[in-house]
Amino acid sequence: MDRVAGQVNSRRGELLELAAAMFAERGLRATTVRDIADGAGILSGSLYHHFASTEEMVDELLRGFLDWLFARYRDIVDSTANPLERLQGLFMASFEAIEHHHAQVVIYQDEAQRLASQPRFSYIEDRNKQQRKMWVDVLNQGIEEGYFRPDLDVDLVYRFIRDTTWVSVRWYRPGGPLTAQQVGQQYLAIVLGGITKEGV
């Protein structure tokens, strides 16, 4: 019985991975159950054995990704000594997500605003608010403790970091000439060059 359950879970994971790649490449509205089933070499009805709809697949993909991301963020905030190191950790965790959860990041970037209006995806707006608070708190702490310039508009800096980081998923491809860590380190150097206090 456990072996059968393991095979079902493994197949479910394979189908989710395939669906994620298709959603990221084509968009949610342009990807049908039939497309995913064809890509998996199964009949559409067989896909319904695993998932009730494409929305269920998207929900599982986004929830899993956001749960992973926020666990990483929380670990960094809870275990890192100072605001500068916390900011660096959050920044690099975001690029880690782009490397290892590329399709989910693309889906999130392309579809989150539209999906957030649906009750099933109400958690997206909650996560956006949590993310903003986490980053803004770190920036404010950095100003208070003398790591970051006191004249910064924290909300503007947060928006810049968020948009600069996550939009890189548009051009960055895992397995290309640069790793996400290399890109993240370059981006981080640019950001820190603009926000850190002289002498830090």
Map each language-model feature to its residues.
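Amphipathic alpha-helical segments used for helix-helix packing
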Residues: 99-119, 170
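Hydrophobic/aromatic residues within well-ordered alpha-helical segments
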Residues: 11, 54, 61, 65, ...
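Short coil/turn segments at alpha/beta junctions that flank glycine-rich nucleotide-binding fingerprints
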Residues: 25-29, 80, 101, 145, ...
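Hydrophobic alpha-helical connector segments
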Residues: 60, 74-104, 154, 158-161, ...
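C-terminal peripheral helix-coil segments that are non-catalytic and often amphipathic
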Residues: 2, 93-96, 100, 132-145, ...
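Helix-turn-helix
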Residues: 3, 14, 18, 22-56, ...
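Amphipathic alpha-helical packing segments from all-alpha helical-bundle domains
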Residues: 67-70, 74, 100-103, 118-145, ...
